[in-house]
């Protein structure tokens, strides 16, 4: 009887161990692929709440803006700049999706990147105002080895209330901050055979502001 109990108990322990090992292996596989990473619920809710609060700060500007007659709302560069003026009071980096838009409080973002280049840990939140009047909250975090991006996107929903479109947490595969002020990075993305078509995870953000003259020349000669 005693031996039987020992055998059953030992079998249960082995089963639990195998289940634990299987879960650890799955967690490792998720971390290795680098995308669709799990997000701590507290961190996630804080990011969502902050994103909604920021949207509400811009609500009056959005409501009075000329949004045209199309179902796909597009606000003017002037409206995006008004929103940027409001958000820059938070003393955080803010950009708009307008071509050659200068980043408000860019030195905060630059300081984070300079520290990361020296393998110093830190994080920074960057807000991007989109053409539909919504925003993206981009939180970059550097842990001393890898850089991660927690992205939250919000749009205007029913009755002009903020609505969260997505929350994603991704490891940045490679990144570089150039002498000319460009921050380029490539996110970890699904690859073949998981997907049949290539997914482009690359992005580039202008950090250092351009002079007014340079911006005007760029607008006339080049359009990104």
Spans of features found by a protein language model:
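Sec-dependent N-terminal signal peptides
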Residues: 1-3
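Sec-dependent signal peptide cleavage junction
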Residues: 5-22
